[in-house]
Amino acid sequence: MSLFTAINKMAGKYDMPILYSCHPRSRKRLEQSGFILDKRVIQHEPLGFHDYNCLQMNAFAVVSDSGTLPEESSFFTSVGHPFPAICIRTSTERPEALDKACFFIAGIDEKSLLQAVDTAVTMNQNGDYGIPVPDYIEENVSTKVVKIIQSYVGIVNKMVWRKF
């Protein structure tokens, strides 16, 4: 329940609505626990990709366990819509985004999460948005992929499929 306690504390500290995209299993667990969310916390069905990205662009901060948060944060920074991005995880598949300071890994405990949100919001307010990850803003990705795949067809056929 420390995550929900942290959400309530964020609502109180920043005195603004918090949209909690709540998976049905999480909603059920929350109801069974009897935990009461702050009145500023709005429980919502999971959002589609477009709606979620529109919300991110206009958010005070984004706190999420989504594995795509690093890419989204980097992309929106590159197009002039940076937002404080805080990931509720203990590791990431995208260390390159962490290296460019596009997002924070907050951990999963209340104290670390609240500290990460405070730091991310303050840095964002001071104009410190991190740097977009160069690999995420490549313009000709499909061309590169086609050329790479085509370049390895002969090797894969020979080494994997034993076609000579």
Language-model features and meaning:
Residues 1-16, 21, 26-164:
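Nucleotide-activated sugar donor-binding and catalytic core shared by glycosyltransferases
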